[in-house]
Amino acid sequence: MSHPDLNKLLELWPHIQEYQDLALKHGINDIFQDNGGKLLQVLLITGLTVLPGREGNDAVDNAGQEYELKSINIDLTKGFSTHHHMNPVIIAKYRQVPWIFAIYRGIAIEAIYRLEPKDLEFYYDKWERKWYSDGHKDINNPKIPVKYVMEHGTKIY
């Protein structure tokens, strides 16, 4: 009744569990949820620590600087997701921290870029103007193009 590949999965499972155990050590509860496996890789490469909870920034460095983290699979899309309810309150929060953008092809990491708040001001200003001109209506997940990140960011990996 089971699929022929079940034995292969069972053979791999101890290694997957080991990966999950490493993720738990770094505050990631599930490598299969919310890009947990990719998040672990980005944290280990950058030396950042995950910030718990769904609100606020995503990670912090040893000096206490917080960061917003984004990842993308460029086989599927060309723009980084931002926030499903973009508004001036969220934009003000985003203006306070650098962003780390991880670019993947499938599950293979290709590059990581860092953008400072000033590097993203073009988008902050554009979103803010749109929010006001649309009658204070939140913007649903505006994207930041991969091309923009690569042209304006500092490649750190």
From Swiss-Prot:
For this chain, the annotated S-S bridges are none
One Gene Ontology term of the biological-process aspect is: DNA restriction-modification system
Required co-factor(s) are: Mg(2+)
Instruction: Output the CDD domains linked to this UniProt entry.
Output: PvuII-like
Residues that hold Mg(2+) 2 according to the record: 58
Where, in this chain's numbering, is Mg(2+) 1 bound? 58, 68
Q: Supply the alphabetized keyword list.
A: DNA-binding, Endonuclease, Hydrolase, Magnesium, Metal-binding, Nuclease, Restriction system
Q: Which InterPro entries match?
A: PvuII_sf, Restrct_endonuc-II-like, Restrct_endonuc_II_PvuII
Q: How is the cofactor bound?
A: Binds 2 magnesium ions per subunit.
Tell me which Gene3D superfamilies the record gives: PVUII Endonuclease, subunit A
Gene Ontology molecular function, alphabetical: DNA binding; metal ion binding; type II site-specific deoxyribonuclease activity
- Give the source's domain of life in one word: Bacteria
Entry EC number(s): 3.1.21.4
Reactions mediated catalytically: Endonucleolytic cleavage of DNA to give specific double-stranded fragments with terminal 5'-phosphates
Q: Please give one Pfam family short name.
A: Endonuc-PvuII
How it assembles, according to the record, is: Homodimer.
Name recorded for this polypeptide:
Type II restriction enzyme PvuII
Organism name? Proteus hauseri
Q: Which gene encodes it?
A: pvuIIR
